[in-house]
Amino acid sequence: DFIGPYRDIPAPDVYTNAQVMAWIVDTYSQLKGYMVPEVVTGKPIPLGGSLGRDTATGRGAVFCTREAARVRKMTLKGASFAVQGYGNAGSNYAEILQELGGKLVAAADSQGAVLSKKGIDAVKLLKHKEKVGTVVGMPGTEKISEDELLRTECDILVPAALENAITKDVAKGVRAKVIVECANGPTTPEADRVLDANGVFVVPDILANSGGVIVSYLEWVQNLNRLRWTEEEVNTKLEDKITRAFSDVHETSQKEKVSMRTAALIVGVGRVADAIKTLGLWP
């Protein structure tokens, strides 16, 4: 068994969705001879999926943005932000941050990018994309390149597409005060050093996009115990866990005088090391 509820539990990512998770549950359960909903997360609700899972990655990143704004003494009301990658995570992030007073000024997908200094309605932009297949052509915006988006003057830059979007050359032109990594590995190591030297506050992917994994864990717990939490309960648990995680990482960053990325690794590896030491040696 390569996967299993106590071995390895897949969840949706690029080019997969709840339907794909449903197929995996069905196939695995057929092989086992009984229903095993806890073998994957991000499932459709009727198959044991968790309420709030579809927005969890974006919502968790917004919670991290709120905490970053707090420690950097920024206000979210009126804060401008640009989102590179207007898929599930990026669009949910934009909609939720907009509700908190943020102003979306630029967005991109695989077809191109758009800009409007006056602001773009996040909900209308998603509807436009669903209708025509791209954010390009959104009324009231001008088309720009993806590189121009990454260099857009804004308070918050959100890479929410694929890895290595922010290279060393791109980093030199970044004008955002804060970067919140919704994507996995969007910043190269060389770019990371440039951003750090330029005083850009980076909330690393291991922390910023952990909302999806956190709610996947909550879905797994619900499945194992045959529970069903409300969306409000799930969001509250997500907020509590990711806010405490941010606090731990930021505290370590300040104490050790390292970047948030290095601090996140120190915290994570430290917890595993503590657990191993507590186990002792066997035999």
Give residue spans per PLM region.
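Flexible, glycine/charged-enriched surface loops at secondary-structure junctions
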Residues: 3-12, 34-38, 73-80, 253-265, ...
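Adenosine-phosphate binding glycine-rich loop
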Residues: 68, 172-283
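A short glycine/serine-rich beta->alpha loop
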Residues: 7-9, 45-53, 204, 254-258
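Glycine-rich phosphate/diphosphate-binding loop of Rossmann-like nucleotide-binding domains
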Residues: 41-44, 49-153
